[in-house]
Amino acid sequence: MATHKPINILEAFAAAPPPLDYVLPNMVAGTVGALVSPGGAGKSMLALQLAAQIAGGPDLLEVGELPTGPVIYLPAEDPPTAIHHRLHALGAHLSAEERQAVADGLLIQPLIGSLPNIMAPEWFDGLKRAAEGRRLMVLDTLRRFHIEEENASGPMAQVIGRMEAIAADTGCSIVFLHHASKGAAMMGAGDQQQASRGSSVLVDNIRWQSYLSSMTSAEAEEWGVDDDQRRFFVRFGVSKANYGAPFADRWFRRHDGGVLKPAVLERQRKSKGVPRGEA
């Protein structure tokens, strides 16, 4: 309590508040959020592309202009070679000037094999130091940054609380990548708030949650995509946002090296009164 100043209520009544600062669509700077998707959907590449944009790169995803600032991306699941492949693929879509801007503004520190644990004092302090002076920190994935039971609300509240403490003290937003539950993935419900694997605290205690979901057979039919091509399409949206106007979900197409770019799709009209196969 001693570290937090009380709010001057009369001053808040009278003075106009400063505008909200968004680090990602609907995500206020200095808060904690999540990107949830099934394994293999492309969330690591999406996170890398968003990190590169905030670091000073172009808006390849067409999610809108985002204020720039230093970013740190901590992949603890993939080896450096895999990160190199993603960067090489992404670099093919950047100009020399854009490459330099991203290199200057983005720090990538692979942690595979380091067993990071945000609940351990030395790791908490190290992550806090890494966040200082930065606009965004990406943790890839949440499971790699703690050793607690994911289905237990108490331990998960503490894990989220550690992230909130870092964000509050440094002003750096934290986005953790997380897997969708098997049930949500099988039912094509990856765009729902409760698609997140583990305790509901992982949804309830954060201010922002986005998703990346693979195209289902029904969606492929709706958008006129051949079934053997739908694996190239993923949908990105925000399933929980405590601030800001609604963010419209959008389709991305996976290109060489896994790079995501906006997909050009047209919703198909349904025929009326004509049985399938007779049109």
UniProtKB/Swiss-Prot annotation:
Q: Does the keyword Nucleotide-binding apply?
A: yes
Highest rank taxon of the organism: Bacteria
**Gene3D superfamilies the UniProt entry points to:** P-loop containing nucleotide triphosphate hydrolases (3.40.50.300)
One MF term in GO for this entry?
ATP binding
Per UniProt, which keywords does this protein have?
ATP-binding, Nucleotide-binding, Plasmid, Plasmid copy control
Which parts of the chain are coiled coil?
none
Q: Report whether Nucleotide-binding shows up as a keyword of the record.
A: yes
Instruction: Tell me a GO biological process for this protein.
Output: plasmid maintenance
Record's function text: This protein is involved in regulating the plasmid copy-number. Increasing the level of this protein results in a higher plasmid copy-number.
Name of the protein in question? Regulatory protein RepA
**Annotated organism of origin:** Escherichia coli
Q: What is the lineage of its organism?
A: Bacteria, Pseudomonadati, Pseudomonadota, Gammaproteobacteria, Enterobacterales
